Amino acid sequence: MLLHHYSGNKINEILSKEQPTEQMHYTRPKGLWASVVGDRDWPSMNPGDLRSQHQYEITLKDENKIRFIDGRKQLSEFIKKYGLKPRGEPRIAIDWVKVATEHQGLIIAPYIAEHTRYPTLFWYGAWGCASGCIWNKDAISEIKLIREAEPFWWFKENPPFL
């Protein structure tokens, strides 16, 4: 599985991230987000020019420590195990602290677009593409810069009228 990370900033160090204790329907995990290269990846689902972003290739150390979801059945099982309904909230939240105690990251690919239409799964609708989040730095064996950002590319191609 080929993973790419896009960032406006250069990455000098990978840090582990603690997961939010806030249990709201919109809460997503904290960590290094990576796009799974291929169908419904970040560039295809978010059309726009990525030349202003640094592009990194991420190599995982041990895929057995990452939770992978590749279909509806696995997504449903994940929600049953880690989902909860905050008091007074009709939508499902995920207990990211619990997920992080059992896994070093979560990757959902392919992106299951029809699940974004369920209002109870707001957290998944915000996932956006075939991607994942790595919150434990020990899950990553290498992060390699494969393309430098071009900060002012638009102005070079579209000079202002003088």
Predicted features along the sequence, with ranges:
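Active-site and NAD+-binding cores of ADP-ribose-processing enzymes
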Residues: 1-21, 47-162
